[in-house]
Amino acid sequence: MGKIMEGFIWETAKELDLKLAQRVRNIRKRRSISQEKMASMSGVSYGSVKRFESTGQISLLSLTKIAMALDIADELRNIFSQVPYRDIKEVINETR
């Protein structure tokens, strides 16, 4: 379970990885793609696809290949693209 801090629930890295894997698995299943077919489409081994979906563990390169095969690479391209500033110091540091 995540940690509660100042009214926010913070997930562990493992929990976040598993949620990401679940989302990718749901997209794969929604498109009626088997794990074997996903492996073939993406060039990622069947074992890696299976491990990712059950544990959340995968290399960034393999995740990118899977995203490209599922035509959701834009989701990766946009990750961290609109991270809000935490304070004015970050704004100042970015303009230097």
Write out the residue ranges for each language-model feature.
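Short alpha-helical DNA-recognition segment
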Residues: 32-50
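Short, basic-rich loop-to-helix N-cap that marks the start of a DNA-contacting helix
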Residues: 56-68
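A detector for short, charged/polar N-terminal pre-domain segments
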Residues: 1-19
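Short basic helix-loop element that most often maps to the first helix and adjoining turn
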Residues: 22-38, 96
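Short, charged recognition helix plus adjacent turn
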Residues: 77-96
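Helix-turn-helix DNA-binding elements, focusing on the entry/boundary residues of the two helices
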Residues: 24, 35, 46, 60-63
